Structures are given as C-alpha cells and as structure tokens.
C-alpha cells in the first residue's frame, strides 16, 4: 500500500521556470509544472500558445532558452549524447500525423525502434511488433499493409503501437484523436485508459478534443500568452472564472462536451470503445 502511494506521488516530469524565445518572440515565460507517475496529463491552448514547442522540449528535440526540465529523473540540459539515447528508450512518442514511413509496411514501421535500439534478430522483432499491434487492437493482417491503406483510426493505433515498441514507462501523445470520427475517437479514449490501467504508464498529451479531456485526463494545463494560465482537473477548470479558460467551456462545443455527470460520457456517440475503426 505504501509503495503504491509513493508511486502515485512520484514526479516523472518536472518543469521549472521555463523560458523559450525565438529572437524577440517569447514563446514561454516562466512555466512550471509537474507530472506524476501514472498520471494522464493534458496540455491545451490555442494555436501559437507554445504547446508543440513545449512537447519538443520535453522529448529532447529542442532546448529551452532557460529553466530546468527533468524527465524520469534526468536533467535534459545536462545529458550527454549516450545518456540522451538511453533516456529516449524509456519513452514513446505518437506524433499528430503518425510519422509512419510510407515505403514500409506497418509491421516494419512498428519494429523500427527495436531494430534501432536492440540486437534482436528480425524474426523476434517481427513477433514483438505483432504483439504491439495486437495490444492496440489491430488484427495481424494489418501488419502487411502500407500506411496509405489504413483508415484514420487504424493509423493512430499503428502509430501508438510503434510508440509502445520499447515498453516505455512514459508516453507522449500529440493530438491523438485529431481527424477521427466520434466512434474512432472513442476507441482512442478507451485505449489510453487501458494502457494506463494495464502498464501504469504516465501519459502526457496535447489535444484540442474536449471529449477526450473529460474522458481520460487527470489534470489539464492551459497555456495562453506564453504562460501557464491554469492547471487542474476538468471540473476544477470548468468552475474557474478565468479569461483563458472560459472559452473551453462556453459556446455550443464546450457545452456539448461537458457531461452533466463528469463520471459519465457527455456524448453517447463517443463512449469509449476498444474496437478499431
């Protein structure tokens, strides 16, 4: 019991006094937050609010101008090249547009991280890649398809399977439901919750999807004007009278996404389903 409580409060990501500038343009100004073990943490904000830049800084694709970013106990600014490679093996990333290579079939796309970071033989890599596809709800025959033959929902699942290839403890999701119909999006909702429940994954996601936020997010951080404007659960944010937060809960879309009972889905067409579309 004590071990479980300690894990729940363990800090997996710590951002302190983060500043990011491109010339005279300020992207982030004094941003600080923490993400705890096995938490589903969401970043939201309008276009140009710095969400994508922040994600890039968290996954070692970009350096902030100043401040501290610690991920899985490591200070990202202090890492050597070999340390950075080792740390990247401990997380997975699902990019917004999938990031799958069009010239490779799905099975080989999913197996790429294993080929890059392990010395396993090709047969075992293919077997492991097949297991990851099954884990995300895709049938074995999907592995033989090229990405162009996949539906939007299948593409998201295949991309997620690749992000899971190295059994990460931390998962980054960039707009995981973007472009999906409600049924397919509901499948992603269910899958995110299942992955956390089964493997204790810590999940950080960027999304504009209010239904997804209500369904799965433990806490949500709101970025606007280069600053972290608010952070809390969806019910806490919904009750907050803040100019950067209110637009997410006002208007037809905000009201439609908000459940009468936060414990139940607001949109019956969007109830979580594990069936891929």
Language-model segments: what does each one mean?
Residues 59:
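Helix-to-loop junction immediately C-terminal to a conserved catalytic motif
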Residues 75, 123-141:
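Conserved ABC ATPase "signature" region
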Residues 146-150, 154:
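Conserved ABC ATPase signature
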Residues 167:
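Conserved catalytic motifs of ABC-family nucleotide-binding domains
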Residues 171-174:
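Catalytic Walker B motif of ABC-type/P-loop ATPase nucleotide-binding domains
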